[in-house]
Amino acid sequence: MAELPQSRINERNITSEMRESFLDYAMSVIVARALPDVRDGLKPVHRRILYGLNEQGMTPDKSYKKSARIVGDVMGKYHPHGDLSIYEAMVRMAQDFSYRYPLVDGQGNFGSMDGDGAAAMRYTEARMTKITLELLRDINKDTIDFIDNYDGNEREPSVLPARFPNLLANGASGIAVGMATNIPPHNLTELINGVLSLSKNPDISIAELMEDIEGPDFPTAGLILGKSGIRRAYETGRGSIQMRSRAVIEERGGGRQRIVVTEIPFQVNKARMIEKIAELVRDKKIDGITDLRDETSLRTGVRVVIDVRKDANASVILNNLYKQTPLQTSFGVNMIALVNGRPKLINLKEALVHYLEHQKTVVRRRTQYNLRKAKDRAHILEGLRIALDHIDEIISTIRESETDKVAMESLQQRFKLSEKQAQAILDMRLRRLTGLERDKIEAEYNELLNYISELEAILADEEVLLQLVRDELTEIRDRFGDDRRTEIQLGGFEDLEDEDLIPEEQIVITLSHNNYIKRLPVSTYRAQNRGGRGVQGMNTLEEDFVSQLVTLSTHDHVLFFTNKGRVYKLKGYEVPELSRQSKGIPVVNAIELENDEIISTMIAVKDLESEDNFLVFATKRGVVKRSALSNFSRINRNGKIAISFREDDELIAVRLTSGQEDILIGTSHASLIRFPESTLRPLGRTATGVKGITLREGDEVVGLDVAHANSVDEVLVVTENGYGKRTPVNDYRLSNRGGKGIKTATITERNGNVVCITTVTGEEDLMIVTNAGVIIRLDVADISQNGRAAQGVRLIRLGDDQFVSTVAKVKEDADEENEDEQSTVSEDGTEQQREAVVNDETPGNAIHTEVIDSEVNDEDGRIEVRQDFMDRVEEDIQQSSDDDEE
């Protein structure tokens, strides 16, 4: 092996060499391969292909030429890379599902939406489309700069004139070193309207531009969900746009349905999309699909048919397909383009500004070129006019000259002509000496003078030049503009909501004393007779018990109000569905409670944006507040303040109202006050509230509810020892807010303090929950109706150390099976009810029963009348002062 001479060996630090070489490579990829120019929207390979087509004369009015011929010419003259990369770039420009406005008119197999590749270049043919001519128009009028090709033997354009904004019209995508670009296509009509608006108002905002440019317009049509992603991308250059297929649910007879997809998202491979759907069905991740077929054809266009099982919900299946397949996907916008040869992230306005400046430059340079040509021609015509005026002398001078050179010099000296004028006279044919030709020269000269004046006016006034740009853009819009294909659906779609995948059904959400939460289908609990055994609703932890329960739809909102006056929000389906015996999950795993924060009220709401509804709050110290429901529509997982109060107070309950109801506030010592809701003026979300009831010593608020002014409803009172009764609402007279209230029950050791005061119609079911986790569901109509001073009847028999922890109303379900024992009739014909209780200390959970006469002997009516009289006297002598603490 021969030794290399030392002079040819250059020692370099490998770190420096790697750094410099990689930087050179990276810049080459960025500037000369992967990123489009902001002015014409083309990468070098695309620009070279189009210029090659133009140089070969492959215009739309000419016949197609073999693709191999085009690729070979481009590769040999301008693009010294692989022929396959050139052909693939040309194929993409010919695909109407890849380019919104195809730049190559291909003949043959140029691929499909299923990912099929194009035929070999020896089989396909191509030429330019009509709109491509507008990218190249005036390229030979010094409108752009030309540069040397790779070997210096040819010249190629550094950028195309681009009479329409191709960067945004057809979009671009590319991966460079350390950066990538992904620009969506747009509608040409909207783009040009946006450029026109920008030209008239340079200070236009992006929001105003979006009045002209609604958003991307994909060649495959489809849907765009919401405008927030579009706005973010237009303002910052980066964003995510949600795309969705266009699908309809059709009836196919026999009560069966099918889903028909007619448009798919941009850049989605249809065949792979169908394979993904089939895979999900095969893996049983999507249930209810019986058949899947592709009926796409040239006649019908895209048509993917999905047959749905008869008992399946087609809407839920479609939403699952959106969630789990490319039927819905996102387009990540990253608007990076070359600006003055450097990669830059640009927003919508910057892209249009750079394009408009490019057009002004193109029109200015073209005008300057035309002006030079016009002046050159006028200069020649001036010489011809001189020659025609002195034709005999001209002929004599030429005849006397020995050579052409002498003749030219003689003409220049004698008639003060320039070299070009003298040469034009020598080149003039004899037939132009006729009178007719003389008139033509005069007419052409006068027209040129007018034309020169017009061109000079354009160059002298920037506004005139700008108007010319507008006129040319308007012409392009009128010739090539079309209707938008992609529909933008408004409504704040950022992503497919989980509730779209979940059937709407009634559920029960329970919350335990130790803050464990879960949901169950409402059908889990069976309607039972008063005094029934109950259903074990959960297995509680030691010293834990169910404290709250609400019924709602899976799609409804649940507002959680805490003792500290904060509010949190969840959807019904966001609470985990667990078994009936499960204790649930810690509520802090669902909402972010603060330390020592306890949920005091759960309330179900369907429409948080309602302007007709209000929330009424009551605290333990008797403070009450009314606030519009819409104030609570923007609640996040961290929660927000719902009401402010003193440190020694806490929130007891919240109720949803219509704004025209009566407020009922009840206390643990069985006092109840009723006053019109209208006496509470609406306050802000964080306001404190005003006094609702004056409390006696040791008393506190335990219940809050509402009733209509002329309501036939009843007040249901339940005590901690399992007693309850119904009393007509009208037995409680209206009084002033802030009073002490009137008696609603007689409190004894037998029935205990009041734990629940609420209104009922008699058509509900009642769920009573004990601290042992026992839940009983009974018909409210089975509860006796008694006077205000009555103690009530036994609703549930409790074991030792058991007490009623919470009570909730649920809708009565006539179809639910009643599995409890029916009412029995005693020997004397008196109707009786059988009561039962689960005693956890009894082996085998034995059920103890006893028969209780349903007729309850109330206290003497005179006691109630006397108590009512004393309440009225006490209320009349009380000062009715309102403490408006806000």
Curated annotation (Swiss-Prot):
Composition bias type Acidic residues, residue spans: 813-822
Keywords linked to the UniProt accession: Antibiotic resistance, ATP-binding, Cytoplasm, DNA-binding, Isomerase, Nucleotide-binding, Topoisomerase
Residues annotated as catalytic: Y123
Subcellular location, record wording: Cytoplasm
Major site of localization recorded for this protein: cytoplasm
GO terms under biological process: DNA topological change; DNA-templated DNA replication; response to antibiotic
Residue ranges of the motif GyrA-box: 528-534
UniProt entry tagged with the keyword Ribosomal protein: no
EC number: 5.6.2.2
Topo IIA-type catalytic domain mapped to chain residues: 35-501
Subunit structure, interactors included: Heterotetramer, composed of two GyrA and two GyrB chains. In the heterotetramer, GyrA contains the active site tyrosine that forms a transient covalent intermediate with DNA, while GyrB binds cofactors and catalyzes ATP hydrolysis.
Family designation: Belongs to the type II topoisomerase GyrA/ParC subunit family.
Protein name from the UniProt record: DNA gyrase subunit A
